[in-house]
Curated annotation (Swiss-Prot):
Keyword Cell cycle part of the UniProt annotation: yes
UniProt GO MF annotations: peptidyl-prolyl cis-trans isomerase activity; protein folding chaperone; ribosome binding
Stretch forming the signal peptide: none
Gene giving rise to this polypeptide: tig
Residue ranges occupied by any PPIase FKBP-type domain in the UniProt entry: 174-261
GO cellular component: cytoplasm
EC number, as in UniProt: 5.2.1.8
Catalytic activity: [protein]-peptidylproline (omega=180) = [protein]-peptidylproline (omega=0)
Role description: Involved in protein export. Acts as a chaperone by maintaining the newly synthesized protein in an open conformation. Functions as a peptidyl-prolyl cis-trans isomerase.
Originating species: Prochlorococcus marinus (strain NATL2A)
Name under which the protein is recorded: Trigger factor
Domain notes: Consists of 3 domains; the N-terminus binds the ribosome, the middle domain has PPIase activity, while the C-terminus has intrinsic chaperone activity on its own.
Biased composition (Basic and acidic residues): 439-451
UniProt similarity note: Belongs to the FKBP-type PPIase family. Tig subfamily.
Amino acid sequence: MSAAKLNVKTSAKPNSRIAVEVEVPANRCKNSYDEALSKLSRSISIPGFRKGKVPKTVVIQQLGVKRIQASALESLLQKVWTETLDQEGIEPLCEPELEDGFETILENFNPEKTLILKLETDITPIPTLKKSSGLTAEVENLIFDPKKVDELIEQSRAQLATKVPVSDRAAQKGDIALVSFKGSFSDDGSEIEGGSADSIEIELEQGRMIPGFIEGVIGMNINDEKTLKCEFPKDYHQEEAKGRKAEFNVSLEDLKIKELPELNDEFAKQASDKENMSDLRADLEKRLKEDNDRKQAKTRQDSLLDVLVKELEVDLPKSLIDQEVRTIVEQTAQNFAQQGIDVKSMFTPELVKSLMESSKGEAEKKLRQKFALQALAKSEKIEVSDKEINSKLEQVEADIKLSNEKNIDAERLKEAITDDLLQEKLFAWLEENNTVVEKTPEKARDQIKEKSSKKKTTKTNKEKKSSKTPKS
């Protein structure tokens, strides 16, 4: 026999929160108390009594009424809350909060009387859009810079460079120095954690080490020893080192320079699968242009999403923001771990607290973007069909087989594909029903003016030359 319907009152609160008042009949309170007493009498061990055969009066005497009432109330709260959610169709985002607190309710709890419970919880917000079409988004036009081809080639040259020993001069900027060092803090002489190394290669370029270190090594000769005075940046990742002055005892053991390969067809074969420099340049230019186009498309999407979010009306609950903040911090930790950084020592409680505080803005922005797209999909009835999902799934599964990937979660893969396809449709709708104004960046405008000015100057000079009267 199912329990009688509960008398429930609900009222909306700010930030997608709901207040729930439940009237629990006295008979249910009494039943819960009796059940708790019976359960405890079966589980408690008391000298002189067999387990499970302890009289209830002895249990009450041993444990006290409040202990039994606490057990009864805890069980009652759980059951009543589950029934309330089911009865009222409430989908909570977090555990409920008791308005008066458990201890206060327990203090006033009488199993013979009706219990009034007042709880609050967060619920999923219902987003709406004031407007979704006829909007205007401004986006900076990303102009492809041919110089990037040369930059990539120079990076490849640096990677394929030969290290040549140097012994007849002091260390210079750009050299590769083999050094050993030991660091300590200037204020108390304590050793710096991770501040010592034996025979490691360091490229003498600014930004490779903390300020003062590279500058100090430059000018040293092989076998020289020197004490460098440095200072850790105020935003340094290790909390105990932030802004502190330090001293490093450094010895220069060896010195090398990078000898770059010549830019010829042999280099093209080494750096790529191309046979000559002409093909290599053409391939790099093609890839860079494609990358530029992808970035431009992403910039357009971001701009359209920004103007759509401005039309969004949504009340974000605290629990959702907190959850998104945790996700951002966890992703940050994973990124550092992938770079080989010791996350456990780096992520101190102070740093985690600081990161969580500073990530709130980003978390709210991401949630607003998510709800704006959800509201658009609902209002415009934009959906992805099973046929579209299965077609894309077949393509992806074929690629997975070719790459010999294993341990793929089929359900998560399908969810990701569905989300991607829906997002494609949503942005296609936004592009079609709104205006994107592309603006030329100021730097690019200056370059265009400069080129135009040079062309005019060249043309004027030619005209001057042609207008001169020839000598007779």
